[in-house]
Amino acid sequence: MWRNALEGRPLAESALMVRESGLAVVSLCRGGFFPGTDSRVRGKALDDNRLAIEQAHAIGAPSVVLVCGAVPGQPLEVSRGQIAEGIAAVLPDAVAAGVRLLIEPLHPMYADDRSAINTLRQANEVCDRLGSPAGLGIALDVYHVWWDPELREMIEVTARAGRLDAFHLCDWRTPTVDLLNDRGLMGEGCIPLGQLTQWVEIAGFRGFREVEIFSHRWWGTDQREFLKRIVASYRAVVAEAEASV
């Protein structure tokens, strides 16, 4: 669930709607955006993350996905340090609420202003730096990490450490015409989705496989038909993964 869906009504009312729907909330998106050149900016980010944790707890979401943030012109190493400091500051709140914080590595094309954490290795390094706390995990989105030559190894590392909490599916279209909202339906692009799904399953992941397609192109179509296409393409990915075992 995205946080903007909680706007415009009391949080308790949103929580009741979720419970009555019978749906399981996998996570709340999003927290993060910890880096800043101004301490006041970083402080506001901490407040917002604490609010996200409160919201997640209220609606029964087990986790908050972190888009960790970056600042154009600020060295990535500095931003990564501020990310670790920010997570450490709000982690006690998350643990107290029974909510896990999930670091989501983003594709390097977002390293300018969305996230200085761009690989599974970097996400694991943050977890290690903070002492591998129980309240911290990692979300793997194939759109962001499919290109990484270390991907299979780092999936195994992440899973062994008990950090592989989320798995997001979509595809990478060629050419990509929008850096944010041109994701493909599974099978429309070049990501080896069956192979990646098999890797996370072999590593021990047993959670939801979440389809996450940001696409102006698909949003402009009949959404019932889009949903049918999602189901069919998802089943094809699963069949490919199972056939390769």
Give the label of every model feature segment.
Residues 20, 35, 39-137, 147, ...:
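Active-site acidic/histidine proton-transfer and metal-coordination neighborhood
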Residues 8-28, 51-60, 91-97, 128-133, ...:
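Acidic (Asp/Glu)-rich catalytic clusters
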Residues 1-13, 33-40, 71-74, 109-114, ...:
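Acidic-and-aromatic substrate-binding clefts and catalytic sites of carbohydrate-active enzymes
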Residues 1-4, 27-32, 66-68, 103-105, ...:
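A cross-domain feature marking catalytic cores of carbohydrate-active enzymes
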Residues 60-61, 117-140, 144-245:
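Histidine-acidic metal/acid-base catalytic patches
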